[in-house]
């Protein structure tokens, strides 16, 4: 892995790459359940999944009703596969560890179907990092009418 101006380029046998996406996951019914211990645990689960798969989280912000990730992975991993691993593994674990969530999230899944994703080139990666970092600040200002 090479680091150039806070941008990571990975080298495999036949590729030199930097595949980064901004991805947003939302709990089912957009319930505000990503708070306290659940928010802490979701961060841990996402970092564990990425470490296990040799992916890299540049930035993450857990809001009460959604999660922003700036995620980098190799080109042989599809966005759909990365989303499936992150959402599937965390959903199962969260439902096991926090059975009280069943009151808010009926059915067998924690996450809403689908996700938002956009690719992030190296020219606008720092802009996206700041956007994700400042989610809580912007949300607080908006909710207070500022």
What is the role of each PLM region?
Residues 1-146:
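Basic nucleic-acid-binding interfaces
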